[in-house]
């Protein structure tokens, strides 16, 4: 379980701030995410408000650390030792970083950004 609230600073080695690591039952994983798990899939515990309402604090994000080629989608990336989970949109001559929560401004993805993983699914914390 990767807690991304206080992040400073190929798989788990890409994350500097790991609070807990756990293993989930394969059947549970398939039931919740409707896909077969792979070694590069990780579950991240979201603790941010910048992507509300898409996901909120307490939701679990399924990420793939092998999917680092940028297309339109939600990614975990690092800039200046700071972790972000944001929507990336390819625009002519730039990549736009977008928060789904409109209280946060968009900005251009810096050229030195390091893509850590792509968010490929979500399990809402209030899902039974």
Where would I find each of the regions flagged by the language model?
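Short, positionally conserved secondary-structure boundary motifs
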Residues: 1-57, 94, 123-128
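Glycine- and charge-enriched low-complexity intrinsically disordered segments
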Residues: 91-128
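Short, well-ordered loop/turn sites that connect or cap secondary structure elements
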Residues: 55, 68-70
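Short, surface-exposed charged micro-motifs
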Residues: 87
């Amino acid at each position: 379980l990767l807690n991304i609230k206080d992040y400073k600073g190929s798989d788990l080695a890409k994350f500097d701030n790991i609070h807990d690591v756990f293993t989930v039952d394969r059947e549970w994983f398939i039931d919740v995410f409707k896909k077969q798990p792979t070694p590069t899939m990780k579950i991240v515990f979201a603790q941010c408000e910048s992507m509300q309402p898409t996901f909120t604090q307490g939701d679990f994000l399924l990420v793939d650390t092998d999917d680092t080629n940028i297309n339109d989608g939600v990614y975990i990336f690092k800039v200046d030792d700071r972790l972000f989970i944001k929507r990336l949109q390819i625009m002519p001559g730039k990549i736009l970083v977008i928060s789904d929560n409109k209280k946060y401004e968009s900005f251009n993805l810096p050229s030195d950004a390091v893509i850590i993983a792509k968010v490929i699914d979500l399990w809402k914390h209030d899902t039974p």
